[in-house]
């Protein structure tokens, strides 16, 4: 069988006000199809933080998992740098 690649992303924690949950801002660079200018696009993802170790401004790695709740499909893997 073919192996599926596990999706992991890096981003900055912008909110940790929820219990065992964080909001991670993911930024990516995309090229405009007509004009060729590179633009920054961003996405906010909710992730599960079981031990509540993250604070705002932390650089973290998250991975995609089975749905935990209505809006949480990501889980915290590790904290790269603390704020």
Swiss-Prot record:
InterPro entries the record matches: NA-bd_OB-fold (IPR012340), Ribosomal_uS17 (IPR000266), Ribosomal_uS17_bact/chlr (IPR019984)
GO biological process, alphabetically ordered: translation
A GO cellular component entry from the record: cytosolic small ribosomal subunit
SUPFAM superfamilies xref list: Nucleic acid-binding proteins
Cysteine-cysteine disulfides: none
Keyword Metal-binding: no
Entry annotated with the keyword Transcription regulation: no
GO MF annotation terms: rRNA binding; structural constituent of ribosome
Keywords: Ribonucleoprotein, Ribosomal protein, RNA-binding, rRNA-binding
HAMAP family given in the database record: Ribosomal_uS17_B
Quaternary state and interactors: Part of the 30S ribosomal subunit.
Function: One of the primary rRNA binding proteins, it binds specifically to the 5'-end of 16S ribosomal RNA.
Official protein name in the record: Small ribosomal subunit protein uS17
